[in-house]
Design a protein with these regions (language model features):
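Bilobed "Venus flytrap"/periplasmic-binding protein-like clamshell domains
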Residues: 5-25, 39, 84-143, 150
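Active-site regions of enzymes building and remodeling cell-envelope glycoconjugates
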Residues: 71-75, 123-124, 159-163
Length: 181
């Protein structure tokens, strides 16, 4: 590594690995820079951002709102879209969300912010690595789970049911989606 080495941190989700693949494997011009990559779960990255561990890092938008004094959003590499927001899922519909044990991908995640805005009475939350939430709900370890990334496309394969699509709820609640239709 050289004195032009930049530490860059992102999650192992497919969006991130796709976004950074060409840069990390020398498939695009890097203008003399070298990159040292660090991959970790989004909640770990959010917490490391609070500590300002990496100069370039993936952040949840919720975490960014708290850290915007120290970080700026790049022109490319951000993943925020319509029809792909977090889902709250369960095995047994009709659970009491006020007392349910809910697995969440992190305290500073945008998914958790949306969950708290949608239902502030949900209090019994357990932070779980995003790729372990589906199996935790399926096994009964958790009553419900807040899923992100590609989990939203496969939760039915685990025999789980959708309680709410928080991305859709947010779009309808704020009418943001109407501006992009």
């Amino acid at each position: 590594m050289t004195d032009t080495t930049v530490d860059i941190a992102f999650s192992p989700c497919p969006n991130d690995t796709f976004i950074f693949h060409a840069m990390l494997h020398g498939l695009v011009e890097k203008d003399g820079l070298d990159f040292r990559h660090h991959m970790d779960d989004i909640e770990v990255l959010n917490k490391k951002a609070v500590l300002k561990t990496f100069p370039v890092t993936k952040l949840s938008f919720f975490a960014y709102l708290k850290l915007r004094k120290y970080y700026e959003i790049l022109d490319a590499g951000s993943a925020l879209g319509f029809g792909c927001g977090p889902l709250l899922i369960c095995k047994n519909p009709g659970i009491n969300l006020k007392t349910a044990k809910v697995s969440i991908p992190g305290e500073l995640t945008t998914a958790n912010l949306l969950l708290k805005l949608w239902n502030p009475k949900i209090k019994n939350c357990v932070i779980t690595r995003f790729d372990n939430i589906l199996s935790g709900v399926e096994s009964g370890e958790f009553d419900a789970g807040l899923i992100i990334h590609e989990s939203r496309f496969v939760y039915k394969d685990f025999g789980l049911k959708k309680i709410v699509d928080l991305g859709l709820w947010w779009e309808q609640e704020t009418e943001i989606g109407r501006a992009h239709v």
